[in-house]
């Protein structure tokens, strides 16, 4: 027991005292001589350095994402101002598409675009010239023929191609590819009401 009493009075064998072995929130490798009174001084010194820094320039700030240059933004605005988007629906299809009427020069390119949109379920049958006359959209599974119709400003459903192209673009609200059996009653001057 004399050895244990001698160990209590003598310094520890490893040379570390209680303060050296205490767990603190300091970073690893920081000196143990730094006390809690020294940390606020360092913090104040670092804070004083940042007080003199200038704020970032207005160009360095991120305004929107993704970053788009001004000329590209303006081009997008101009394109959207000229665009005449209308919804396109197919009888029996659970989804709609949009088509830009201003991007097409006439009925034939519009019908080709409609076929391209719904190529997975529709095929083109018949064949006329390049004007799109005589072509019909046919369902691949059932064989039903579809006729392109549109709703005008007055809410009347009319056949696509019954009016001049410019008048069609101005008055079209939406396009519907109807089954030809349902579109029998549609005519250029008759309303569906």
Swiss-Prot record:
Biased segments, Polar residues type: 1-12
Tissues where this protein is expressed: Highly expressed in roots. Expressed in seedlings.
Principal localisation: nucleus
Pfam families: AUX_IAA
Motif EAR-like (transcriptional repression) per record, residues: 23-27
Compositional bias of kind Low complexity: 21-36
Localization of this protein: Nucleus
Listed Basic and acidic residues bias regions: 39-53
GO CC field: nucleus
GO biological process terms on file: auxin-activated signaling pathway; regulation of DNA-templated transcription
Annotated family: Belongs to the Aux/IAA family.
Role description: Aux/IAA proteins are short-lived transcriptional factors that function as repressors of early auxin response genes at low auxin concentrations.
Protein name per its UniProtKB record: Auxin-responsive protein IAA23
Organism expressing this protein natively: Oryza sativa subsp. japonica
Lineage of the species this protein comes from: Eukaryota, Viridiplantae, Streptophyta, Embryophyta, Tracheophyta
């Amino acid at each position: 027991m004399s050895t244990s009493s001698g160990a209590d009075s003598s310094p520890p064998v490893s040379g570390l005292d209680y303060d050296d072995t205490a767990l603190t929130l300091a970073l690893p490798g920081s000196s143990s001589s730094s006390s809690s009174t020294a940390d606020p001084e360092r913090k104040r010194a670092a804070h004083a350095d940042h007080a003199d820094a200038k704020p970032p320039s207005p160009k360095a700030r991120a305004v929107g994402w993704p970053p788009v240059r001004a000329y590209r933004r303006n081009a997008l605005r101009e394109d959207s101002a000229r665009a005449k988007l209308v919804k396109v629906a197919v009888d029996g299809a659970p989804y709609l598409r949009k088509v830009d009427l201003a991007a097409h020069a006439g009925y034939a390119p519009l019908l080709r675009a409609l076929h391209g949109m719904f190529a997975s379920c529709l095929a083109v049958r018949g064949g006329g010239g390049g004007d799109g006359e005589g072509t019909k959209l046919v369902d691949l599974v059932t064989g039903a023929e579809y006729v392109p119709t549109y709703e005008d400003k007055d809410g009347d459903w009319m056949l696509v191609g019954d009016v001049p192209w410019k008048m069609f673009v101005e008055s079209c609200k939406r396009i519907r590819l109807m089954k030809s059996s349902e579109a029998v009653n549609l005519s250029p001057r008759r309303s569906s009401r």
